[in-house]
């Protein structure tokens, strides 16, 4: 038993005690290549708007909890009716998006810069399909562009009132004088 423990002590000292380390370069160019500065928090206060699919107050609680776990978040506002989440703080946009997606919610950056002014009917609010698909944020998998547009007929942005569609070529019952 003494000889076996002696051999195991020697093998431990030779092989496992000093792990293999990366070689240190003395050249400045190699140091700059291998040692980059860690990413710090953004220098300015940022406001990040997200469009998150939420159906109840439980979903709202899950989203808030996931965002408040991030370092640098000052405040989180959730508008459940519009499915909009506004985050204010010293945090990066992609980290917030990734945290919400890890919580199990479908999320994307808010595609509408301000309240829409050109829609005339409440059925068409927030249905602008021109900017829904963003390839760089993996919206094909996580976004809203898969099931919404399947089988739906395209509705023009002119609205449902009769006066705006009176001379429209797409309207079957339009004026035939033109």
Curated annotation (Swiss-Prot):
Lipoprotein listed as a keyword: yes
Alphabetical UniProt keywords: Lipoprotein, Metal-binding, Methylation, Prenylation
Positions of the HMA domain: 45-108
Propeptide segment residues: 176-178
Amino acids binding a metal cation: 56, 59
Classification via Gene3D superfamilies: 3.30.70.100
Residues anchoring lipid (S-farnesyl cysteine): 175
Known function: Heavy-metal-binding protein.
Alphabetized PANTHER family for the sequence: COPPER TRANSPORT PROTEIN ATOX1-RELATED (PTHR22814), HEAVY METAL-ASSOCIATED ISOPRENYLATED PLANT PROTEIN 30 (PTHR22814:SF288)
Subunit structure: Interacts with ZHD3/HB21, ZHD11/HB29 and ZHD8/HB30.
Designated name of the protein: Heavy metal-associated isoprenylated plant protein 30
Organism: Arabidopsis thaliana
């Amino acid at each position: 038993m003494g000889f076996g423990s002696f051999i195991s002590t020697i093998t431990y000292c030779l092989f496992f005690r000093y792990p293999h380390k990366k070689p240190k370069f003395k050249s400045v160019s190699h140091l700059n290549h291998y040692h980059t500065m860690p990413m710090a928090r953004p220098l300015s206060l940022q406001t990040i708007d997200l469009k998150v699919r939420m159906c109840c107050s439980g979903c709202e609680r899950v989203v808030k909890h996931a965002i408040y776990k991030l370092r640098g978040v000052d405040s989180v506002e959730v508008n459940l009716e519009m499915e909009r989440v506004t985050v204010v703080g010293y945090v990066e946009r992609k980290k917030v998006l990734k945290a919400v997606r890890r919580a199990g919610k479908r999320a994307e950056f808010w595609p509408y810069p301000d309240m829409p002014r050109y829609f005339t009917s409440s059925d068409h609010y927030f249905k602008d399909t021109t900017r829904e698909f963003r390839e760089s944020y993996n919206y094909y998998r996580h976004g809203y562009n898969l099931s919404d547009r399947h089988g739906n007929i395209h509705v023009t942005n002119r609205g449902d009132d009769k006066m705006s569609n009176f001379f429209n070529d797409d309207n079957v019952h339009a004026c035939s004088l033109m």
